[in-house]
Swiss-Prot record:
Gene name linked to the record: foxp1b
Start-end of DNA-binding region: 448-538
Classification via Gene3D superfamilies: 1.20.5.340, Winged helix-like DNA-binding domain superfamily/Winged helix DNA-binding domain (1.10.10.10)
Pfam families assigned to the protein according to its UniProt record, in alphabetical order: Forkhead, FOXP-CC
Ranges where the record places region Disordered: 1-41, 229-263, 379-413, 590-659
Protein name (database record): Forkhead box protein P1-B
Note on domains (UniProt): The leucine-zipper is required for dimerization and transcriptional repression.
Compositional bias of kind Polar residues: 1-16, 32-41, 595-605
Phylogenetic lineage: Eukaryota, Metazoa, Chordata, Craniata, Vertebrata
Amino acid sequence: MMQESGTEAANGTAHQNGAPPSVEGHREVRSKSTTPSSDITASDIINFQQHQALQVARQILLQQQQQSSVHKSPKNNDKQPATQVPVSVAMMTPQVITPQQMQQILQHQVLSPQQLQLLLQQQQALMLQQQLQEFYKKQQEQLHLQLIQQQHGSKQQSKEVSAQQLAFQQQLLQVQQLQQQHLLSLQRQGLLSIQPNQTLPLHTLTQGMIPAELQQLWKEVTNSHVKEENSVTNNGHRGLDLSSPSPVPLKNHNQHGSTNGQYISHSLKREGSTLDDHSPHSHPLYGHGVCKWPGCEAVFEDFQSFLKHLNNEHALDDRSTAQCRVQMQVVQQLELQLAKDKERLQAMMTHLHVKSTEPKPTPQPLNLVSNVALSKTAPAASPPLSLPQTPTTPTAPLTPLSQTHSVITPTSLHSVGPIRRRYSDKYNMPISPDIVQNKEFYMNAEVRPPFTYASLIRQAILESPEKQLTLNEIYNWFTRMFAYFRRNAATWKNAVRHNLSLHKCFVRVENVKGAVWTVDELEFQKRRPQKISGSPALVKNIHTTLGYGPALSAAFQASMAENIPLYTTASIGSPTLNSLASVIREEMNGAMDHGNSNGSDSSPGRSPLPAMHHISVKEEPMDPEEHEGPLSLVTTANHSPDFDHHRDYEDDHGTEDML
């Protein structure tokens, strides 16, 4: 009240001097900064104007309620005077600056640019108040005429009056919020200094909002508010009171309120459209007869009782506002978690679909000594296997075969030439379950499938309805099932043609369509590895030459026999066996001193080829028909690296070798 009296005194002084109050106030601040009048700021003036507008609105609403009560008792109809505009409303009109006064201010440069901008914004607020006053007068005239007509009217006319009164309330609240928005914008720009004891009404609802958003907000709220108020007014559950605004728009404010001054405008639009789409008996906070307000969970028999509960228990108060803020924080946390999960999923998909350019570090392979210890506990019939390691192997699906081990590991032979390791054809393990289980992975990721060309060709033919395919159909199956074969077509297609022509299990049949390829299963099974032919003393000779003696179990002897199928009796006792023993002994002794990751990659293009000991070890057995004579496991020390390209018909190019 002291601020209001001081403001009125300042306004009176300004009117007597013939200058606007805001300009006079600024002059006093600049000339007499030490006087008590400098405490009166523009925020005080705006707060006083808002207080006056609020009093006017309350007086008008009280008069309207009295008129409505008089309308209910017809005996006192003649005694009710007409509604008039209070005098306090007319007192605010002379504060508008005339064009002549504005020109004088600009010529004399009385105000600084910031003060001039503040003055203009204040004048805009005053113009809005004048428009509201004119609206008051029109509404009062219309209400007075309608009250006279309602004495002989019907209930339908009373509904229209209630709707107009509701519109009047909304216009009043809209003007108040616009004024408050101007004040907050001035505060952000540093043009106003709000004292701690000064209150900012509707601060949490309007902070961070621009006038366009505010108009859109009230446009949406008004539509839903009019619908709700019409239904509630018809049932007679509530009256019109400015001090207790309607729960419907305030609920929307709570749901889309501000957290730390940030207003979510797109959520408001989405919520408004969602509420419009709901059926008359559905509500986002109502489901299966239970109130979904956080912490409520009250049970209701019908939708109308839920609406009563929502309007009464969850109206705008401190508790509901706090619950709404908590819910907003929960939603924000969930959105952050969702964003993190989406980013993680995108990274996973990118990693799986894009082939890595850097080789991944592979797990430390087991050396020969550890395999000897493992082979003692393993069954003698289980052959040692190894899953090929490629740069993309860590992303490939791991089958049970990945848990087996190799006797001669890539690390232990890092200085040895190309090593071919395949498990599907050698150990009679079908590739159908693996392809079916990891079909989507092979179709999308550029990962080299761990199968031989012969196995893939056989699988393609067996999957066909007629168990026969043309060469072009085989090509199409490769590109359809494996993303790896959608590039470098010239390389792998040449390898497919070599396998079809060299393996006896693939039979070429001429028919009406042309030449088709079929599979001879009996011949395909003959390609399985054979036991070492010749004297059984070969195994004993091998492990005694290596120097391990009785440390090698029977299972390891069988493993050695499996991994050296090309060794025949012709090579027994030859000097090459002693050379093999010395080389393997040297490599085994130095295997623990270095773990070169490049050695784990068996591709010829990535394996180091030193000047000495170019040894090519091939585990896959080849048919005797494919060679001109018996081949020894170990070649000469100066063996050419091109040996594999001439001998290995399954892979035409070393860089595209199937692992």
